[in-house]
Amino acid sequence: MAATEPILAATGSPAAVPPEKPEGAGSSSDPECNCVGSSLPEASPPAPEPSSLNVAVPEAIPTPQAAASAAPELPLGPAPVSVAPQAEAEARSTPGPAGSRLGPETFRQRFRQFRYQDAAGPREAFRQLRELSRQWLRPDIRTKEQIVEMLVQEQLLAILPEAARARRIRRRTDVRITG
């Protein structure tokens, strides 16, 4: 313990104390031993000296340019936040103003009306759009064909003339894709 007291005094932290080896440990079988004439490669770097324990190694701290070039495909902004399944279920079953459940049309409108300035960065915008699309398209209960059908119908409504769109919307209330 006497050997670790100077390290504690120098660093002020017991976490920086290297683990003590048993006194009977042989140095010839220890792969971490840096013995003269040993043919074994050194497994770990030598322990830093007590005076340099609190000094950061410049090579270990990446510069912003190095970090950007190492991962250019990552979107910028805050890290994604996972949504609890319970909160997801509550959002789907939240009653509307008349006490009924919100329908796919409500979630479609929320998805389409979402704007980037509503989010705190690209990652958060992506997370929110993904959540809104899942609430609208419900991939957990709908087939791929049903989801494609919903997307095609929406695109058709977007390109139809106003009169045809009004007729289609009136008929649309009777049609409901259920899962």
From Swiss-Prot:
Sorted alphabetically, which Gene3D superfamilies does this protein's record hold? DNA breaking-rejoining enzymes
Q: Where are the transmembrane segments?
A: none
Domain of life where this protein originates: Eukaryota
Q: Which ranges carry the SCAN box domain?
A: 108-166
> Bias category Low complexity: which stretches?
60-80
Signal peptide location in the record? none
Which SUPFAM superfamilies has this protein been placed in?
A: Retrovirus capsid dimerization domain-like
Which Pfam families does the UniProt record give? SCAN
Q: How does it assemble?
A: Interacts with ZNF202.
Main role? Answer: May regulate transcriptional activity.
Query: What's the name of the protein?
Result: SCAN domain-containing protein 1
